[in-house]
């Protein structure tokens, strides 16, 4: 039998059995593409090619793949030769029909550990691509253990294998499967309220929503992040399919008996809350699986708002057979299961550190930690797995009970920027990679040298549900403080809720910043807090906490959410205010960063300052102000607001203004 005959026979068998498979093609770039093109020519299908520079249609970049979720393809090629976008790879696997091949193009097998991976630029905070040896070895180990996955290496013999026959698969007929039928029955009888259907890919969520619409007695409107992702839902809903984009739906005032939101987790929470409040009955479908991190947030944060929530789960695959080899290998390679939650860890708690090398030496340990963190955090995705494995500057603590993981803490090194770079960040001229909290302390705080301090940021913390409320989280933080004794502070950035803030307070953190926008993933405002470890860290924490207290009333009015601390009602312009105001007027500090001191400036200035007063005192929108002041665009408006701030400062004290300009990076070169 020729190679093509063997390939076609194996593909026919896969179609009959309702499964998909992964073929890894490893070698020089040109050789890999040539093999992929030969297989593509031998098998009919869609053959979506995912690559930064795909040679054939249909194609898309890994970053654009998100827009195709909800669609189906027969066969696909994923080019990871330059860099492995694990989330896009997993998402692509979820779009493939039964009987499909997923071809994964990789560099020469022997170079995987040492070869720089361009995807690392997204998660390593490094200026250049870095090798990713832990992930490479993990992937090799996973592939070598799976006889259902094929590996074709350049200059190595390869033949298409034969596999024992499986049970013949009966594809879905369009009629509801047993799981779907049970949920449809419950939905038809549901009183006014919110229902969710959650499941991994391929379980028929979109089909279920379409079937429900086609069979319901009332009317329904469908919304989703993108209409292109509702193809399956539309096919099942038939002529009763009525789609409106989320923003258009809010603006329209349209009404219906049901609102059906497909892939609800991908819609920003504030927008989703507004939509939900408008309809008597709401059906939300979403994917809860590791490659779509916000799907977890949908469970952890959004769904928790509805105590009478009707929650349904689809477990049986509909679009392929159970135990599909492709689904299994993707789940194993990217650790999508949650075995860490299967058994409660009983016994005395021991806390210890572990390092990235553990992924090679004792992989079960970091795997269990990652599973725990994934289950507890709404943002965890394969990008975090790659960062955990190979990014520099990561620190890990585990709390174990009888060798089972009961808690985990993940910290990231931050700060230590040069004085010059920290000042440039404060001015708004530079935004170097990484350093989330350290940069924010400089860019949004009052101290131009804040980013020179050295800290460790809490990236993730989790405790097993069976061991919560025992103080394990606080023990982990206390241990982290001892390990970071040479640092100036520990920091944390989190979606603010009163409950979460109480935990960080108990750990010793001081609140230093509240953001101006709600997070898309949680619907909460971002809060930042410091736990000082050195004298310099204490001074910074006290200074920024006091600044937040001075700005508390203004931020509360602006955000519509109370700041959880005692406001200081000091209206005098102090030294920090003057420095910040000069930074806004003559550099590039953002307006929202400067809300407090700008409000205080307006109290002191007798000038009209219409661009500033219109925005800050009247809360007019940028569009309203541009029309009122006859200027075109936000850039021109911001330039005018800076110029008016400069005018007010000079009118109050021209000498002080000039002396502060002189000590800014670049001195007086920056125009107001």
Curated annotation (Swiss-Prot):
One GO cellular component, as annotated: cytoplasm
GO-annotated molecular function: 18S rRNA cytidine N-acetyltransferase activity; ATP binding; tRNA binding; tRNA N4-acetyltransferase activity
EC class (word): transferase
Keyword GTP-binding attributed: no
A Pfam family that the UniProt record links to this protein: GNAT_acetyltr_2
Reaction(s) this enzyme catalyzes, per UniProt: cytidine(34) in elongator tRNA(Met) + acetyl-CoA + ATP + H2O = N(4)-acetylcytidine(34) in elongator tRNA(Met) + ADP + phosphate + CoA + H(+)
Protein name: tRNA(Met) cytidine acetyltransferase TmcA
Enzyme Commission number: 2.3.1.193
Major localisation: cytoplasm
HAMAP family: tRNA_acetyltr_TmcA
Binding site for ATP: 180, 202-211, 319
Organism: Salmonella typhimurium (strain LT2 / SGSC1412 / ATCC 700720)
Family statement drawn from the similarity comment of this UniProt entry: Belongs to the RNA cytidine acetyltransferase family. TmcA subfamily.
Entry binding sites for acetyl-CoA: 461-463, 468-474, 506
UniProt keywords, alphabetically: Acyltransferase, ATP-binding, Cytoplasm, Nucleotide-binding, RNA-binding, Transferase, tRNA processing, tRNA-binding
Function: Catalyzes the formation of N(4)-acetylcytidine (ac(4)C) at the wobble position of tRNA(Met), by using acetyl-CoA as an acetyl donor and ATP (or GTP).
Location(s) in or outside the cell: Cytoplasm
CDD domains named among the record's database cross-references: NAT_SF
GO BP terms: rRNA acetylation involved in maturation of SSU-rRNA; tRNA acetylation; tRNA wobble cytosine modification
Domain N-acetyltransferase intervals: 349-531
């Amino acid at each position: 039998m020729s190679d093509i005959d063997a390939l076609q026979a194996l593909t026919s068998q896969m179609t009959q059995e309702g499964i998909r498979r992964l073929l890894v093609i490893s070698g020089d770039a040109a050789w890999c593409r040539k093999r992929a093109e030969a297989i593509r020519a031998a098998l009919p299908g869609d053959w979506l090619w995912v690559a930064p520079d795909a040679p054939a249609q249909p194609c898309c970049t890994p970053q654009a793949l998100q827009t195709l979720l909800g669609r189906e393809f027969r066969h696909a090629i994923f080019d990871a030769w330059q860099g492995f976008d694990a989330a896009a790879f997993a998402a692509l696997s979820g779009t493939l029909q039964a009987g499909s091949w997923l071809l994964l193009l990789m560099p020469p097998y022997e170079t995987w550990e040492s070869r720089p991976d361009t995807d690392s630029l997204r998660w390593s905070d490094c200026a250049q691509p870095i090798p990713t040896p832990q992930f490479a070895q993990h992937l090799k180990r996973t592939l070598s253990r799976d006889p259902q996955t094929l590996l074709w290496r350049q200059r190595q013999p390869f033949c298409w294998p034969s596999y024992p026959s499986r049970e013949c698969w009966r594809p879905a007929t369009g009629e509801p499967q047993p799981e779907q039928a049970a949920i449809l029955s419950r939905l038809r009888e549901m009183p006014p309220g919110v229902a969710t259907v959650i499941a991994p890919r391929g379980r028929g969520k979109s089909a279920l929503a379409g079937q429900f619409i086609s069979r319901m007695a009332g009317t329904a409107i469908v919304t989703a992040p993108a209409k292109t992702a509702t193809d399956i839902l539309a096919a099942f809903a038939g002529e009763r399919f009525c789609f409106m984009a989320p923003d258009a739906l809010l603006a329209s005032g349209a009404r219906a008996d049901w609102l059906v939101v497909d892939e609800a987790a991908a819609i920003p929470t504030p927008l989703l809350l507004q939509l939900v409040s408008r309809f008597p009955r709401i059906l939300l479908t979403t994917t809860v699986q590791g490659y779509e991190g916000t799907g977890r947030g949908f469970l952890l944060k959004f769904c928790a708002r509805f105590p009478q929530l009707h929650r349904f789960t689809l477990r049986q695959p509909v679009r392929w057979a159970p135990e599909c080899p492709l689904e299994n290998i993707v789940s194993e390679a990217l650790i999508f299961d949650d075995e860490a939650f299967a058994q409660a860890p009983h016994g005395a708690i021991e806390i210890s550190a572990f390092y990235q090398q553990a992924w090679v030496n004792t992989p079960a340990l970091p795997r269990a930690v990652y599973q725990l963190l994934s289950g507890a955090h709404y943002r965890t995705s394969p990008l975090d797995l790659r960062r955990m494995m190979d990014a520099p500057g990561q620190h890990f603590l585990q709390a174990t009970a009888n060798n089972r993981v009961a808690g985990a803490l993940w910290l990231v090194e931050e700060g230590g920027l040069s004085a010059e770079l920290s000042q440039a960040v404060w001015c708004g001229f530079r935004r170097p990679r990484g350093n989330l909290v350290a940069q924010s302390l400089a860019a949004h705080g009052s101290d131009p040298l804040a980013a020179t301090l050295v800290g460790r940021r809490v990236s993730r913390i989790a405790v097993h549900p069976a061991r919560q409320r025992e103080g394990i989280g606080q023990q982990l933080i206390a241990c982290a403080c001892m390990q970071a004794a040479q640092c100036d502070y520990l920091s944390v950035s989190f979606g603010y809720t009163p409950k979460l803030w109480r935990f960080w307070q108990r750990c010793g953190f001081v609140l230093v910043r509240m953001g101006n926008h709600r997070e898309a993933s949680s619907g909460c405002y971002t809060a930042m807090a410091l736990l000082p470890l050195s004298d310099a860290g204490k001074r910074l924490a006290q200074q920024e906490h006091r600044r937040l207290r001075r700005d508390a009333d203004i931020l509360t009015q602006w955000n519509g959410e109370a700041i959880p601390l005692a406001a200081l009602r000091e209206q005098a312009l102090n030294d920090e205010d003057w420095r910040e105001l000069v930074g806004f007027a003559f550099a590039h500090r953002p307006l929202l960063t400067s809300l407090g001191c700008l409000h205080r400036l307006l109290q002191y200035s007798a000038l009209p300052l219409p661009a500033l007063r219109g925005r800050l005192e009247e809360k007019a929108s940028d569009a309203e102000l541009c029309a009122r002041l006859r200027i075109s665009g936000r850039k021109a408006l911001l330039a005018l607001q800076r110029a008016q701030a400069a005018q007010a400062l000079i009118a109050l004290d021209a000498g002080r203004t000039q002396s502060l300009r002189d000590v800014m990076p670049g001195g007086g070169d920056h125009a107001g």
